[in-house]
C-alpha cells in the first residue's frame, strides 16, 4: 500500500475508535465528538511503540481541510441569527458570554506570567479548557506564523490534558451555583414563563371588532399601528363575507379584523380599533384558504415582498414568515431568503398562482448547491490569508483558516442569496459536513500529539497542565455565574444555557436541558450566545498568542 493509502486507513481506524469512545456516557454526559481526539492518541501511542510513521503532508492537508469544513458549516448554520443575537434581548446574554471569554483570556495571561508556562502549552491548555476545537486550530496556525516549532503536537497534547475537566468544569459550575443560591428549578421555570411576555414572543392572532367611530371610512394603512409594521391584518369579515384586505381597503364599523402579531403589539391595536371577540376565522369560509409555502424559486431570492406583486395580482396576503425557526411579522420591505416559510391567505382560485411565483418545491430543500459552498470556502481562505499589520506586533494578524471561512460564512448566510446562488444548506447536509470536518481535524491532532501523551501524563507535567486547565475553566464560569445571578437576577435555566453556550459545548447543553426537561429555556440562551462565543473563541487564541509573544 502507498503511504497515502496507509494514512487514510489509519485515520478511518482513529475515527471508528474515537466515535466509539465518544458514545460512552456517565450520567448522560460523555466526550461526544471529542472522543476522536483520544482515539487518535491511543492509536498514535501504539504506532510510536512500533516505529510506524505516516505521510506528514497528507496529515497536514486533512487537518486544515477538516477545520475549514467545520468552521464554514458552523457559520452557515448560525449566520442568519448571528447579527440579530447581538441586539435586544440577546445583548445581556452575549455581554455575559463575552465576559466569560475575556476572563478566560485574563486567566491565561496570569498563568503565563506567574508559572512561566510555554506559549504553545498554555494556548493548548486554554483551547482544551474551553472545549473549543476551532480555537486549537487557530492557535496552531498563529504559532506556526510566529515560528514556534512543534507547536501542533505540543498544543494538541496540552489540549487533550485539559479537555476532560473542561466538560466536567461546566457541569460543576452549574451545580455549585444552584447550591450556593439555593435555587428551586420549578420556581425558576415559572418565573421565566411569567417574564417571557416582556421578551420576544412568538406570534399570535386575535379577532377585533371595529367599534371606534373615528376609524370609519379610513383606509386600513391609515389606522394607527399598522404603519409600524408590527401587526398584519390577514382577513376581514364584513357581515357574512370574509375577504383578504389590502392596505387601501376602507374600514367600516362592525368589521371584524383578524390580526397577527406579538402580544404587546396586539394589545395596543385593540385599544385603537375596538373590542376583541371570540369568532373563529382560522377555518376560512367561502373560497378563501390559507397555506404554508416555502421560498425555493431562485428568481424571488432577495426580492422585497412588495415587489412580488402577489397581493395586487392575486389578492394574496403573507401573514407570517418563519426564518430559521424564528417567526417574524412580514412587512412590504422584507427581503425573501431561500427556505423562508410563508403563511399566505387568499382565494382558492388564485393562491396557486402565488405559490408558483414563490416556489414551494419541497425537493429543493433537500438539495445542496455545491457551487456556493466552494465559493464561500474559497473566499474564506482568501480573507483568512490577508495580513493586518498592527504597529508593535512582531507578525501581521490574520484571521487564518479558522477565522476567515467563519466570517465569510456568517456574512453569506446573513445575505442569504446573490442572484440564483443561495447559501441555504439543508440541516442534514450541514451536520454531515460539519461532523466529517471535525472528525478529520481531531483525528490528525490526536495522531500528532499522541506519541508522547502517556509519557507526559505519567512522567512529565501532565498533571500540572490539568490543574492549569481547571483554573481556566472554573474561575471565569463561577465569577460570571455569580455576577449574572446576584446582580443581574438572571434566570437559573437561562444561566445554565449561557454557561454551556459560552463554552460552545453540546454535552453541557444536554446536561442543562436535563435539569428541567421540555422547558427549552437553556437551549434558547445557548442558541443566543453560541454564534458570538464561537467567533470569540476562534479569535482569542490568536490575539493572546501575539500579545504574549510581544510580552516575552
UniProtKB/Swiss-Prot annotation:
InterPro entries assigned: AAE_transporter, RCK_C, RCK_C_sf, Transpt_YidE_put, YidE_YbjL
Entries under Gene3D superfamilies matching the protein: Regulator of K+ conductance, C-terminal domain (3.30.70.1450)
Residue intervals passing through the bilayer: 4-24, 28-48, 67-87, 95-115, 157-177, 370-390, 402-424, 438-458, 463-483, 495-515, 529-549
Localization of this protein: Cell membrane
Domain RCK C-terminal: from-to ranges: 190-275, 277-360
GO terms (BP aspect): potassium ion transport
Gene Ontology molecular functions: monoatomic cation transmembrane transporter activity
Keywords annotated in UniProt: Cell membrane, Membrane, Repeat, Transmembrane, Transmembrane helix, Transport
GO cellular component: plasma membrane
Protein topology in the membrane: Multi-pass membrane protein
HAMAP family (alphabetical): YidE (MF_01016)
Family: Belongs to the AAE transporter (TC 2.A.81) family. YidE subfamily.
Stated name of the protein: Putative transport protein HSM_0534
Organism per entry: Histophilus somni (strain 2336)
